From Swiss-Prot:
Name of the featured protein: Unknown protein 19
Organism from which the protein derives: Pseudotsuga menziesii
Length: 9
């Protein structure tokens, strides 16, 4: 799932 900043968690 992507985080709000667009990076993968």
């Amino acid at each position: 799932r992507a985080t709000v900043n667009g990076l993968p968690a």
